């Protein structure tokens, strides 16, 4: 096969090939996400511009089905190698095994992966055609990354901890195990809808959900007609095999080289790893706790070594006794994945050619423009600034485990022995928003820290649960926190008195001033001795009679200007400027005599070049479990989830409005930092963000953001339980199901008869379980339209329906579906689409259009 002819080049997107008769053939796009167990696949993902992160690599995956033979594997391996040769060194290679795919791989297929029986590529036709004469049972597993596997059509396949989908062509019944979480149910439902929409001609199938068997007798009757009567109890839930963060933190780096005819694998280092351990002429294996094996190839390594990368990784896996399905990722020098880079303490893109100036480096010296920060979230995220700090500020000090207000005159004067709450109020695009900073002093007690959190919760309740909460550790204050106090943040090494005043422990005190403007200056008290000095900074030495301003040789004019602002906060005594090297004797006497101190010029702090990463959080047996979401977008934020966004300088924890474990969020963030293989600082700020109240510093990390995305979506409970928000659609479903033709029902006659009889049962019982099918929206029960049957045929006039109060509508018109009574021509004219097209859209999008056009 001529690879170059079939190669999509660097065109962005996803491209998939399947093994067939010892060769690889393209998979039609409509079949993406479906994998046949007796085949191997090659998947190429090329980042799409402008979404792609600058310098992002392509990913090339080799996927092996559980039943794949040697011929299929050989064809896929050879094809992948030839693709790699065509693409060059900017490609990350992956080996994937069915049921154990990497997070990167799973991120391509939303809402889930379908594993199918069969071994012929012709089976792909089953994915693309609209067959309704089908009976199959799918076992659905997973939280963020969902998969569905075809299993035996029997009750023996069921267990209490998973979700099962009985697909009968014209009807799909999702059975939720009693031990499944609300998040798993919602994800399962999303996959069910996706299957229905892709495989049933855009949605021509009803969906039923069994959450409680006792409350869904009709659906259970259908299931028993197909599966037979269940004998005995269900199997217990299968224990989860999730890999927790402690396991992932067990990282070891090995140097792999040849010595004569032997291959030597030498353990080189354990965390924290540094980038300089990797030499460009060598070959390395990085073992992440047996969970994943990375192979790093230096740019000067031999062609033979690079071609042997996978075989060496497989040999390493066998030697370690790891499972054969262990994931393998091969990265090239200069094209490392984000996951690989974050296994190292720091990572510099020193080898990247013609690198443009990064947003943060370029912008940090630019004067802040509040308007741009409000309208350009990406800039706000890079600078970590929601505005210039000129909003309203309220401060409380935690004393006697309660919050005490701090006099505004003393705002910005914090004590290391205390904890503080700082509430910042600002406006963005006409909307009031809040940030609550939880500042923790180094000398604060455990009880005070606990009181800090409980008082923050009380404030959040007082403000209706809309506060963004940022946990800040003394000395690691984020830029916006510093900007709030306009360069006058001073941290005293003491405890605050009951009136918010510092209780002085000494008459001689030394303060270090660091910063060049009102947005980055911090002043901290340090031990009053000569060894605390540093030539790069300015120090204020306060004695009983005078306040010395000591200017180190490495400081500049901006630093001196800020020091003169700070000195007015610290002391009212006479000021005396002292240049390094020209100190009077009394200066050294106050410090207890001369002593060595750092005198070399401080190098600029290097800004880490790590890409942001998004994870779904959960826990297993008390340990944090993360599932990474590659190529993330706002669509990946689900109301039932807690998501962790790691931007390296901050950790955001996004709390979905229906998340059940939100109280664990901060602890999860702390555990994430503690167990991170790169040895992250535990003082990294942790920010709690509530769904619907995201600040621009969070929004800016997403390519696009829709602030109204969640305003019209029905909840999972509304959909399943038939709450008022979905009640009007349930009768429509019942009406359509009542009109199903027995001849179109799949399976034998008895099953069809039982199913039809069950579905013709009382509407009361089905209302709790049947989920709306968009195609059914044009149907009505006879009782609901009897009074308007005459006018429906011709349609009501638009002025009778648009912008009308409920009491002003014609008799018999359903207020929730008033648009339905328009004539077909009026409907097309107003909505720009036919009724069939309109009712095939998602419910929330229908509501949105109806609101805009006056039909709500």
Curated annotation (Swiss-Prot):
Keyword Repeat: yes
Annotated GO MF terms: actin filament binding; phosphatidylinositol-4,5-bisphosphate binding; structural constituent of cytoskeleton
Tissue: Ubiquitously expressed in 16 tissues examined.
PROSITE patterns associated with the record: HP (PS51089)
Extent of Low complexity compositional bias: 776-791
Keyword flag Repeat: yes
Regions annotated as coiled coil: none
Alphabetical list of CDD domains matching this protein: gelsolin_S1_like, gelsolin_S2_like, gelsolin_S3_like, gelsolin_S4_like, gelsolin_S5_like, gelsolin_S6_like
Gelsolin-like repeat extents: 22-74, 146-186, 263-307, 401-450, 521-561, 624-665
Residue stretches making up the HP domain: 790-856
A Gene Ontology BP annotation from the UniProt entry: actin polymerization or depolymerization
Gene Ontology CC entries for this record: actin cytoskeleton; cytoplasm
Family: Belongs to the villin/gelsolin family.
Described function: Possible tumor suppressor.
Protein's UniProt name: Villin-like protein
Organism, as annotated: Homo sapiens
